[in-house]
Amino acid sequence: MRTIAVSQQECEELLQRITVGRLACSLDNQPYVVPVGFSYEPGCVYIFSTLGKKIECMRQNPKVCLQADEIRNESDWLSVIVTGTYLELGEPQYTEQRQHARKLLERHNNWWLNPLAERRERTDDVSIKTVFFRIDIDAMSGLRATP
């Protein structure tokens, strides 16, 4: 197997093609990684969630990493790493951006069901707070493995 760096264009093409990645955040020197659905746009990634550990971590330490990949087998894959800064789109000045994020994310079937359904199963509160946020990309790189 050979591993090579890929172009910025190839990284962006992967992020436009897939909708699930792994979001890494950290608090008190403890990393935390979770799968997330996302929508890519040049310069940023939009994500929807409910309140929980990842949101609390990112509110205190906004530096995050998103990893996304396409794996055919152990020697044929493409992986992209995005590092950036968390920006919550909850304040009134972000209303247009939040609506834009929602439109992008709505393109994916059932984009909102999983986090809400899971949270509602564990509580009687049907008014679970949802959070739209953006990762402003600081850096992006990718690797491809070929047989």
What are these regions (language model features)?
Residues 1-17:
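Extreme N-terminal tail/first-helix region
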Residues 50-53, 105:
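Short, solvent-exposed aromatic-acidic interface loops
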Residues 27, 68-70, 136-139:
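Short, structured patches in soluble enzyme cores that scaffold and shape functional sites
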Residues 53-81, 87:
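Helix-adjacent hinge/juxtasegments
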Residues 18-50, 66-67:
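Short beta-strand segments
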Residues 75-147:
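Charged, gly/pro-rich active-site loop segments
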Residues 50, 69, 145-147:
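Surface loops and adjacent helix of pleckstrin homology
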